[in-house]
Structures are given as structure tokens and as C-alpha cells.
């Protein structure tokens, strides 16, 4: 009878035997409606304690019994429900003894939750405080081959962990249950697909009904393939694609690790740069060059100890890391590598030689991190290359001066081009008759910081950096303008300018030269060009094209520094050259070594046979001049006649010279 009475009271007050209830976070008023979709039409004021009990409900459907005051009568009800969002709790109410209604509401709510857990795309395991399995969803079954009803109540530690892992996990589990904080963990789990890596996002929840128990909900995502993809990307990011060796990034990490764990032992870095690799690459193509890099890497590896690491930071450079080493050991290694790389490499039917230059640096004396020690090994390598290639150098602090000088030149030579700090000096050439018909233009740098800088101090850097191209173009055009000024004063002379190998590819110079000749009303080209023998060797086809284009403009072509480089009679016959310049080393030794006199006579004889003019440079004494004139030299230049001088100074010198003549 009590059940009927309570149910009738509930119906009379709320209009339903099983009304829908709702409680918000901001109010302790319990709102009722006949169904979930209708607006609340009845309310009951709860005590703070009653409201707090309802707010303890979680997202998992649960029930609690509560005594409510309805129409001044006490009514015991079952509230079945859950937390439906961040700020609301809702469910159904039934009279305390209406067991079928309570069971129906619980079944409805729990069946929904069960379906969500079962069909989720995560492996969901619910554990109690002892680590026993309470839920084991379908994805867990698929991965493990175990059924939920077989594992319920069993220890997760025994089923899926080794003894050592289980002991550690039990300790951690007790700590986590005490703190109640959510956490994430990555675990390797044995599955039907082998060992798989799962990321578990773990959260603690209260049972919400009956005995207040705490459960751990573990939601796991299989991240095995994601981690493998990340590892592949990591390997790609740290591996040279051509040789398979570690790249610069990887090597820097390895060097830093070696230095940090050196324990007072020395760590060495050896920097290798292949000589003439670019020429091989240009001649035979990139596929050939790539194969050569692979073969070279194998050759270098054959010279290393088992614990030494080879890397390719890029281009034609290699790095070797040696831990627990010494300077003598690194020098011995460098010698082995140099000896091996002097042997030819055969790729297909082609045999090539590629030596290398080697720099050595050690930690701690040359640097305490990878950046410093690599930089110093690089500096030592460039010192070895400048010293003649095919050798090694150990870094010394004095070598840094080269780096500082390079940086100073890199900054200030660019400013010099922009701010008109370059000037041209002219040195006259005297014919065997004593006439001045031509000059040589020699560039100088009037630095505000260092004063007048000779070309030997900056031309090599200009060639290395590529600044020689705009610098050379400026020289040619400025010389033409100066010759035009002299022409207007009645001084008609030709001027020779030097062209380097880097300038040969600058086809814009011909257009610019044509344009300035037209602007200044020249009917002829007053410019002669001086090419070194190395220009002809490095790219003979391009050199031939350049010579022909200058010749078409009316310029004469002189072969500079003849006899000091790669001279051959075939070059003199092939290239349309107008004159050869006898290098000053022959002139200087004329009266010191009899063989020099014979060489000069032979060179003059060959030139005359080919109808070429011969110009001697570096003439400093009357005795030298007499020998050269007697043996058929057409023009001479040197300090005996005049030093290089600015254009204004040359005009004064020229007027005095004409008066003496």
C-alpha cells in the first residue's frame, strides 16, 4: 500500500509516475517535467547537501535515493540519471518502492553508456583500485583475442605485463589512485598483431551509487604506425640521402653528446673537402657525381676505426668524429685517408682522381661544443687547401685571422663597390722603339679604414665570392670612360684589362661594352683583354667563345703569365690570341740562371713563328731590358719605366716622357 501511495503522490504532484528531473550547477532547485522534451512545470527546493549528492553523479548513469517534501509530506524517491553536460544533471524519478521503474531507467541509461564504451574507436579498459579489470571493450578484444567475460576480475598487471613492469605499475597505480589526477602514458602491449604501442589517456571516476568506489578509465589509442612514421621522418631528417651517412644535424648532436660525455678525454673532428669534385660533377653529370660521393664515403670508412663516425654535411664535404682520441691519432687517420684518396675511382668505364684537403680540431682546446669545433676544423681545412691541397692541417688560433679577414672583406668589399672606393692605376708599356702605345689597368681599393689596398689582398677573395664579376665589369667600363677622356685630350692609347675565369660566364659585359663604346663615339675598341692560362684550361669552349666575341668588338687578346701555368703549343695554335705576356719570374732570373735566357729565346721564337707579339712584365733593371730588347721582345713594362699610377699622375708622366723622347 505504501508503494501505491507514494506513486500516487508523485503522480498527483508531478503529473507522471516517472517524471523527468533536471538540476543545474547554479541553482539548488530541482525541476520536473512529464517528459524529457517538455518544459519543467514543477520545482522542489533542495537542501545544499541534497543538491551536492546529485552533482556527484558522473556521465555514467547511476541512481540514488532521496527523501523529498511534497505537499508537506515526505516522499522517498529514486533519482536515476547522470551528468549530461558541464553544468547540468538530469534523469528520471520513481517512487522508492517502484523497483520496475528504477530498473527500467537504469537499464536505459546504462545500455546507452555500455554501447558507447563497447563501440568506441579506442581500447577502453576500466580498472578498480587493485588493478582488476571491470570493463574490456570490443576493440580490446580484437587486439588481444581475449573475451571480456574471460578477463573481468583478473589483474591487468598479470595479463599484460612482465614482472618488472607489473611491480612498477602497481606502485604507480597506488600513487595515481591517491592523487586522483588524470594522466597519460605510453605502453607497449602484446597483441594479436605483435607488440603495439598505445597512448593511454587515464581518468579517475567515482561509482556514483552504492559504495563510493573509484575506478580508472583507460582509453588507449594505437600509435604504433604514427611513431614509426615519426621515426622514419627523424631518420630522413638526420641522414644524407645520397650516401646514407649522418648529415650535419645528426653529426652536431653526436659531437655534442661525445663532448658532454668525454670524461676528460679528447674528442676530435676531421673536416674533409674533396678537391676538384665540381669539375668532375660538371663534366660527367650529377648521377656520376653522386656515385663518386658514395664510393668516396666507402673509401674513407675503410680508413676509420670501428668507433669513429663519418658524416656528410653537404656538397663535397665529409666530417669524421673520433672520441677518446689524440692529435697524433687524428693525424694518422688523415694520412690514411689522403693516401687512399690519391688512388683512382672507377665508375663504369671512367676512371677519375679526387684528392682532398683535411682540417683537424680537438675538444676541449679548440672548442667546447659542436659549432665551435666544426668551425675550427673547417678553418684548418681551408688553410690546408690554400697551402696546396692534398694535405692536412691541425687548427691553431692564428688561423682565425683568415676567418676574420674573410668576414672583413665580405662586408667591406661590397661597400667599396657601392661607394666608389675602387680606383684604377695605369702602368705604361714601352715598345722596343721606346714608344708608349698601351697601358695595363690595375685596380686598387682606397679603403677609408686601411688606406690603399693592393689587388693581391682582395682579388682572390673577389674571385671566390663571385664579386669579381661586378668588379671586373666596373673596371672595363671605367677604363673605357678614362680612355675617352684621354682621347679628347689627344692621347690615343690602348689599355689592357685582366679577365678572370669567373668572369668568362658574364655575357652581359659584351652588351655593356658595346653600349658604352657607342655612347662615347668610339669607332674602334681601345680595350685589350688579358686572360690567364688557367682560364683556357678550366673551360676551353667558353674561353674560345669569349675570345671570339672580344675579337669581334676589336679588342686584342693577350695570354697573361705565359709559362707559369698550363702552357702548351696546342693552345697557342687553337685560340686566336694576339700576344703573350712573359711572366716576371723569367725576367727576374735572366741573369741568375742561364736556362732562363734559353727559355726566353725559345718562347720568343715560338711566338714569332705564330705571328704573336711578346710582352715582358716585371722589368726592373737596364740589364734585363737590354737582353729582352735584343732578343725580340715587342713591349716591356715594369718599375724600370714606371710604377702603376692614377690616371692624372699618368698624364703628367706621359707628358714628361714625350719631352724626353
Curated annotation (Swiss-Prot):
Disruption phenotype: Leads to overproduction of curli fimbrae and autoaggregation in cultures grown at 28 degrees Celsius.
Residues annotated as domain GGDEF: 265-397
Catalytically driven reaction(s): 3',3'-c-di-GMP + H2O = 5'-phosphoguanylyl(3'->5')guanosine + H(+)
CDD domains: EAL (cd01948), GGDEF (cd01949), PAS (cd00130)
Protein keywords: c-di-GMP, Hydrolase
Induction: Constitutively expressed at both 28 and 37 degrees Celsius, during transition into stationary phase, more highly expressed on plates than in liquid medium. Expression is RpoS dependent and repressed by H-NS.
Pfam families, alphabetized: EAL, GGDEF, PAS_9
All residue ranges annotated as the PAS domain in the record: 109-179
Claim: Ribonucleoprotein is one of the keywords in the record: no
Sequence ranges assigned to domain EAL in this UniProt record: 406-658
One MF annotation (Gene Ontology) recorded for this entry: cyclic-guanylate-specific phosphodiesterase activity
Presence of keyword Hydrolase: yes
UniProt EC number: 3.1.4.52
GO BP term, example: post-transcriptional regulation of gene expression
Role according to the record: Part of a signaling cascade that regulates curli biosynthesis. The cascade is composed of two cyclic-di-GMP (c-di-GMP) control modules, in which c-di-GMP controlled by the DgcE/PdeH pair (module I) regulates the activity of the DgcM/PdeR pair (module II), which in turn regulates activity of the transcription factor MlrA and expression of the master biofilm regulator csgD. PdeR acts as a trigger enzyme that connects modules I and II. It inhibits DgcM and MlrA by direct interaction. Inhibition is relieved when PdeR binds and degrades c-di-GMP generated by module I.
NCBIfam families: GGDEF, PRK10060.1, sensory_box
Subunit structure of this chain's protein: Interacts with DgcM and MlrA.
Name listed for the protein in its UniProt record: Cyclic di-GMP phosphodiesterase PdeR
Organism: Escherichia coli (strain K12)
Amino acid at each position: 500500500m505504501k508503494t501505491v501511495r507514494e506513486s500516487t503522490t508523485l503522480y498527483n504532484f508531478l503529473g507522471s509516475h516517472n517524471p523527468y528531473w533536471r538540476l543545474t550547477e547554479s541553482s539548488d532547485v530541482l525541476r520536473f517535467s512529464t517528459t524529457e522534451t517538455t518544459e519543467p512545470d514543477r520545482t522542489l527546493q533542495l537542501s545544499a547537501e541534497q543538491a551536492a549528492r546529485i552533482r556527484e553523479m558522473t556521465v555514467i548513469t547511476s541512481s540514488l535515493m532521496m527523501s523529498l517534501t511534497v505537499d508537506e509530506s515526505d516522499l522517498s524517491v529514486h533519482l536515476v540519471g547522470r551528468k549530461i553536460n558541464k553544468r547540468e544533471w538530469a534523469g528520471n524519478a520513481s517512487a522508492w518502492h517502484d523497483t520496475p521503474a528504477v530498473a527500467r531507467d537504469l537499464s536505459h541509461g546504462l545500455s546507452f553508456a555500455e554501447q558507447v564504451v563497447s563501440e568506441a574507436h579506442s581500447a577502453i579498459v576500466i580498472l578498480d583500485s587493485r588493478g582488476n579489470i571491470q570493463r574490456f571493450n570490443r576493440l580490446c578484444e580484437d587486439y588481444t583475442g581475449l573475451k571480456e567475460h574471460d578477463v573481468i576480475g583478473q589483474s591487468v598487471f598479470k595479463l599484460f605485463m612482465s614482472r618488472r613492469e607489473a611491480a612498477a605499475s602497481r606502485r604507480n597505480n597506488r600513487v595515481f589512485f591517491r592523487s586522483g589526477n588524470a594522466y597519460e602514458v605510453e605502453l607497449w602491449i602484446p597483441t594479436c598483431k605483435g607488440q603495439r604501442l598505445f597512448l593511454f589517456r587515464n581518468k579517475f571516476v567515482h561509482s556514483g551509487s552504492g559504495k563510493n568506489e573509484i575506478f580508472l578509465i583507460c582509453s588507449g589509442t594505437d600509435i604504433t604506425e604514427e611513431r614509426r612514421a615519426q621515426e622514419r621522418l627523424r631518420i630522413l631528417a638526420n641522414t644524407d640521402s645520397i650516401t646514407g651517412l649522418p648529415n650535419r644535424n645528426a653529426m652536431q648532436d653526436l659531437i655534442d653528446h661525445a663532448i658532454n660525455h668525454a670524461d676528460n678525454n679528447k674528442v676530435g673532428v676531421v673536416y674533409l673537402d674533396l678537391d676538384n669534385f665540381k669539375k668532375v660533377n660538371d663534366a660527367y653529370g650529377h648521377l656520376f657525381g653522386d656515385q663518386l660521393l658514395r664510393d668516396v664515403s666507402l673509401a674513407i670508412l675503410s680508413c676509420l676505426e670501428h668507433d669513429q663516425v663519418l658524416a656528410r654535411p653537404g656538397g663535397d664535404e665529409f666530417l669524421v668524429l673520433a672520441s677518446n682520441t689524440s692529435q697524433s691519432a687524428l693525424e694518422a687517420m688523415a694520412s690514411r685517408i689522403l693516401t687512399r684518396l690519391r688512388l683512382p675511382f672507377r665508375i663504369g668505364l671512367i676512371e677519375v682522381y679526387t684528392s682532398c684537403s683535411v682540417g683537424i680540431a680537438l675538444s676541449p682546446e679548440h672548442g667546447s661544443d659542436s659549432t665551435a669545433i666544426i668551425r675550427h676544423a673547417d678553418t684548418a681545412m681551408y688553410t690546408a687547401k690554400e697551402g696546396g691541397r692534398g694535405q692536412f692541417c691541425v687548427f691553431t688560433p692564428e688561423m682565425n685571422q683568415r676567418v676574420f679577414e674573410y668576414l672583413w672583406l665580405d662586408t667591406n668589399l661590397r661597400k667599396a663597390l657601392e661607394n666608389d672606393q675602387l680606383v684604377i692605376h695605369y702602368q705604361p708599356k714601352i715598345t722596343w722603339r721606346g714608344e708608349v702605345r698601351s697601358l695595363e689597368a690595375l685596380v686598387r681599393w682606397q679603403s677609408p679604414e686601411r688606406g690603399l689596398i693592393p689587388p693581391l689582398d682582395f682579388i682572390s677573395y673577389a674571385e671566390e665570392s663571385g664579386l669579381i664579376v661586378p668588379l671586373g665589369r666596373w673596371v672595363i667600363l671605367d677604363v673605357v670612360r678614362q680612355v675617352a677622356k684621354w682621347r679628347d685630350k689627344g692621347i690615343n692609347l690602348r689599355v689592357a684589362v685582366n679577365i678572370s675565369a669567373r668572369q668568362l660566364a658574364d655575357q652581359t659585359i659584351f652588351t655593356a661594352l658595346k653600349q658604352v663604346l657607342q655612347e662615347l663615339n668610339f669607332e674602334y675598341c681601345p680595350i685589350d683583354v688579358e686572360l690567364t692560362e688557367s682560364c683556357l684550361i678550366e673551360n676551353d669552349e667558353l674561353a674560345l667563345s669569349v675570345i671570339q666575341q672580344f675579337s669581334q668588338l676589336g679588342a686584342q687578346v693577350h695570354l697573361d703569365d705565359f709559362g707559369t701555368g698550363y702552357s702548351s703549343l696546342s693552345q697557342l695554335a687553337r685560340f686566336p690570341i694576339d700576344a703573350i705576356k712573359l711572366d716576371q719570374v723569367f725576367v727576374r732570373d735572366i741573369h741568375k740562371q742561364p736556362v732562363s735566357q734559353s727559355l726566353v729565346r725559345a718562347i720568343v721564337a715560338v711566338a714569332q713563328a705564330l705571328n704573336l707579339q711578346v710582352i715582358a712584365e716585371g722589368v726592373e733593371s737596364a740589364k734585363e731590358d737590354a737582353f729582352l730588347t735584343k732578343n725580340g721582345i715587342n713591349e716591356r713594362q715594369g718599375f724600370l719605366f714606371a710604377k702603376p699610377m692614377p690616371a692624372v699622375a699618368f698624364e703628367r708622366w706621359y707628358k714628361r716622357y714625350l719631352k724626353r723622347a
